[in-house]
Amino acid sequence: KAGPKGEWHCQPDNGTFELWFNGRNLFPDTGAYVYAGSAEVMKLRNWFRQTRVHNTLTLDGRNLETTQSVTGLWQPEGREQILVTENPGYKGLKHRRTVFFCRPGLFCNSGRSHRQCQRNREFELSFREGAVNVDAEKNMVTTAYEGPSNVKLQLFPEKARL
């Protein structure tokens, strides 16, 4: 969404994303509030800029420490379209997001963090308004929106929990 040179336009980027399908925003981003203003306006702006209120990874609930995001691969043509971004958002932790568009209507969004630690890593997601079903045994969330535009999200790591 922003990256190192444009972070003031949104929020410091750590692989933040939105997903639109069939004209519906399935994973809306909170965006940014305004550029400047009174103390009350700045309080709201700072709330919207927090890492934890965007579709991305956080460590111990903290804001990013660095915004050195890079695009590792952008392959928009061919049988599979692929986007890879990477950000060392926290000291000693690298976050890589890979999005594969496999066929019309099917994509895989893989968020990985590279670090051996006991610290709390959370993958923050904002679903659009509507029915969301949680299956804690399968580590799976599905949406039940009207129409064909829905989401199935499943966590695969052994220790991951919804």
Please identify what each model-predicted range represents.
Residues 1-27, 76-77:
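Carbohydrate-active enzyme catalytic cores, enriched for enzymes
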Residues 1-4, 21, 29-30, 61, ...:
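Pocket-edge structural micro-motifs
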Residues 6, 34, 45:
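Histidine-centered metal-chelating micro-motifs
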Residues 27-30, 34-39:
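Cytochrome P450 core scaffold surrounding the K-helix E-X-X-R motif
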Residues 38-162:
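CBM-like, beta-strand-rich accessory domains located in the C-terminal region of large
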